[in-house]
Amino acid sequence: DFSFCAGIPNENLLKSIPVRDFMLIAANNEDWYPMIEHTFGKKAKKTLRYAIKKEPDIFDKEYLKSIVESLDDDYEIRQFDCEVFELAKKENWSVDLCSQFENYQDYKERALGVAILHKGQLVSGASPYAIYKNGIEIEIDTKPEYRKKGLATVCGAKLILECLANNIYPSWDAHDLRSVHLAEKLGYHLSHSYVTYECEFSK
């Protein structure tokens, strides 16, 4: 879902990108921007994303544990198991928690994640949106009516702890300033903003 353009701008290269309903396109220099806008027209919306520094030793484990322990007793936090995986697939708000995996077996072999349930209902989760050697890109989503309750913070803290316990780096890339704020709350630091094009082809 994410394409990164580098080198000399090339329109044929842009046109060769496999089209999906939604994808993100970024580039290493602004010379690409006019070509991206010309190639995709109104389907390409110019936005800012925020790169977060990769600092393996900055996390305060005791602080993160205290966040997890602050979760209200009305909620249950658990590992991303088969039941949670199937629940995540069923709703639009949560599908990205598992969309990069063929099935639960694939998820179990390559990923790790955490979820918060309320009365048996999945209400928040943190899971890999991308996987690379010794690291993941964190995806956090919360059911709309359960937002602003601190659930995303708890999920993020728990997944970071799980990653550290398994020698996996929990990488973070923020799509907006709210995501930056959450990242900073968990111990990360902002590096810089960068231009991205959100391209929708489903409309």
State the predicted function of each range.
Residues 1-87, 197:
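Acyl-donor-binding surface of acyltransferase catalytic domains
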Residues 34-41, 175-193:
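Conserved active-site alpha-helix within GNAT-family acetyltransferase domains
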Residues 138, 148-162, 181, 185:
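Conserved acetyl-CoA-binding loop-helix of GNAT-fold acetyltransferases
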Residues 16-17, 154-169, 189:
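Conserved acyl-CoA
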Residues 53-54, 185-203:
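Terminal substrate-recognition subdomain of acyl/acetyltransferases
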Residues 20-29, 163-175:
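Conserved GNAT acetyl-CoA-binding A-motif
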Residues 4-12, 139-148:
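A short, internal acetyl-CoA/4′-phosphopantetheine-binding micro-motif in the GNAT/acyltransferase core
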Residues 103-143:
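A conserved beta-strand-loop-helix scaffold within acyl/acetyltransferase catalytic domains
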